[in-house]
Amino acid sequence: MSFIPQGANLINGNWVRSQDSFTSQPVSGAPQSFSVATEEQVHQACIAAEAAFVSFSQTSRQQRAELLNAIADEIEARGDAITEIGTSETGLPAARLQGERGRTTGQLRLFAQHILNGDYLDRRHDGALPDRQPLPRPDLKMVQRPVGPVAVFGASNF
């Protein structure tokens, strides 16, 4: 296998290490050291995420869908290597990881289609009823708008 784990945190396009680390014993028994992010590194990652949010929020629905489909394409193109890395890191059988990979790419493509359809916007419009009693109803419009980056704490076991 040609993949060598970085053991670092990817922050704003750069692999960043800290002095604190932990060691994991993957299936091969060879120890791998992984960097533990400092509070400052987490802060820098949040700043980078905010900057990315600002620029990404200017992209079209088509561009966003294309990005998700491109990610799915890359995962599929690198499928064998991803499976090999996953089995060596976790000990899970290849069939399980291939299933997880298929689920992931399927969800990415589903989300891409959801974006293209515009369903996520959940636009609503309640027209004005000026003659409504006991009080008139104003023209009400609701549109979903992104507010910024989201931190996700997910499983890291594979």
Where are the language model's segments positioned?
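Conserved small-residue-rich beta-alpha loop and adjacent elements
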Residues: 125-158
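N-terminal Rossmann-like NAD(P)+-binding subdomain of aldehyde/semialdehyde dehydrogenases
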Residues: 1-138
